């Protein structure tokens, strides 16, 4: 059992003003501290200026989580809406917030078929798309070089049957877009961990999980610098039991690390959340967990109530169960 204490500041403020809730931490112990005490790198969450400007949400992030992923501000439509015209307001906010509060950052995401500007989707020339791809990755990564622990270099490039998705990148460049993206990323920031990230990688026997592991194994053998596989882990209720074996399958591909990158679970049962945490703990290459939001209030799946804090920012039973399990 990890021994944890409540922040003294919370106790002092609560004693001084029992009616003051906004801005105070809502959980008795930091899930990040407990997880790191077990040898992992971080237990994090996602956010952007909107949610991080909410004082209650921000207080929980500062007190309980150790890593941040930008929810939308680093995606292509946000950073390069027009060719060669970059916009970093939202991403800068996230990076400045994280660095000033001592949070690790996972950059998300450099190459994705969704939230992709029309001008990129309309490219049909191989040389043009190669140039655009390299320039985008280089410009974004250079801006934050040395501040990002890991980058999701490519995101959601697989179909459910384990084949490669027919995105503009694949249609124009073929499978080689993966090599171009990772080699460019490595040249820009050699210290950053470079990830391939996807969803529905939660069952070792699922075609997509097998396809991911097989392709990554092949790409690594070809010298493509892939450091990690990110499993988003958006789960339905009861979907946690297969996560451990799936992580082991992904880890067997030859990557140096794996991570749970966008965790949320319909219903947020204590059993499901503890199962996922234990899965990461049991897989030596699993370096951390990121939940996809703090409170159900801001969740993209709000109707499923999938997060660790309810819409009033109170910790759920699952949060406390994780602390107890650790």
Curated annotation (Swiss-Prot):
Question: What does UniProt give as the signal peptide span?
Answer: 1-19
Lineage, top-rank taxon, reads Eukaryota
Q: What is its EC number?
A: 3.2.1.8
**Reactions this protein catalyses:** Endohydrolysis of (1->4)-beta-D-xylosidic linkages in xylans
What is this protein's name? Probable endo-1,4-beta-xylanase C
- Does the keyword field hold Secreted? yes
| Pfam families membership | Glyco_hydro_10 (PF00331)
Inducing stimuli: Expressed in presence of xylan and repressed by glucose.
What's one GO MF term for it?
A: endo-1,4-beta-xylanase activity
InterPro entries assigned to the protein according to its UniProt record, in alphabetical order = GH10, GH10_dom, Glycoside_hydrolase_SF
């Amino acid at each position: 059992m990890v021994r944890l204490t409540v922040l003294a500041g919370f106790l002092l403020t609560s004693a001084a003003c029992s009616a003051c809730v906004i801005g105070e931490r809502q959980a008795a112990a930091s899930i990040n501290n407990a997880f790191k005490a077990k040898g992992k790198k971080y237990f994090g969450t996602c956010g952007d200026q909107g949610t991080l400007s909410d004082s209650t949400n921000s207080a929980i992030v500062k007190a309980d989580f150790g890593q941040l992923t930008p929810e939308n501000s680093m995606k292509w439509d946000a950073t390069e809406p027009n060719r060669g015209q970059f916009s970093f307001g939202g991403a800068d906010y996230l990076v400045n917030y994280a660095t000033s509060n001592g949070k690790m950052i996972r950059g998300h995401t450099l190459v994705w078929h969704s939230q992709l500007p029309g001008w990129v989707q309309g490219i049909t020339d191989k040389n043009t798309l190669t140039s655009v791809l390299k320039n985008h990755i280089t410009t974004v990564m250079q801006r934050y070089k040395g501040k990002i622990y890991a980058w999701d270099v490519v995101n959601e490039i697989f179909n459910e049957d384990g084949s490669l998705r027919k995105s503009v990148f694949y249609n124009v460049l073929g499978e080689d877009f993966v090599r171009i993206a990772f080699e460019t990323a490595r040249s820009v920031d050699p210290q950053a961990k470079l990830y391939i990230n996807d969803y529905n990688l939660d069952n070792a026997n699922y075609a997509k999980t097998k396809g991911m592991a097989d392709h990554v194994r092949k790409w690594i053998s070809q010298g493509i610098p892939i450091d990690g596989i990110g499993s988003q882990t958006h789960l339905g209720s009861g979907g946690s039991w297969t996560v451990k074996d799936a992580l082991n399958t992904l880890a067997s591909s030859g990557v140096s690390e794996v991570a749970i990158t966008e965790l949320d679970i319909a219903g947020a049962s204590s059993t499901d959340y503890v199962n996922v945490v234990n899965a990461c703990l049991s897989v030596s290459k699993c370096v951390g967990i990121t939940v996809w939001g703090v409170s159900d209030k801001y969740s993209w799946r709000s109707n499923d109530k999938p997060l660790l804090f309810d819409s009033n920012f109170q910790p759920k039973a699952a949060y406390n169960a994780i602390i107890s399990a650790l």
